[in-house]
Amino acid sequence: MKSRLILAAITTIGLVAATGETVATEKISLRVTPNVSNAPSNVIVKATVPKHADNRWLLVEADSGAFYRSSAIQLDGENAPLVTEFRFNNLPSGEYTVAAVLRNNLGQETTVRRTVLVLSRFGEP
């Protein structure tokens, strides 16, 4: 009986934690292609932001530490497109963190990140 209660408690905690994460990622999702490519690489970033009156800004950035590129657009709340596409052309080799930051009308931010590997012609980042 005691083990069932412990199992139920762990399951409940896990579901609450998972639900919290799901809510956060529903505000914005990110698809980056290709995940691995050769330099110079053209990377396409598709940010999906559900329409909401509070959405104001979307910033997407690619950062390898040695190279940085970003782009931002203003969102028109419920009239903004569901999917916004960004292109980062001719990225040099490196391991990039691609991040999308959604800012609402109160200045609160939601961030999602992906990793992209751009290899040199010798097969190294």
Where are these regions (language model features)?
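Short acidic/polar inter-strand loop motif in beta-rich domains
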Residues: 102-113
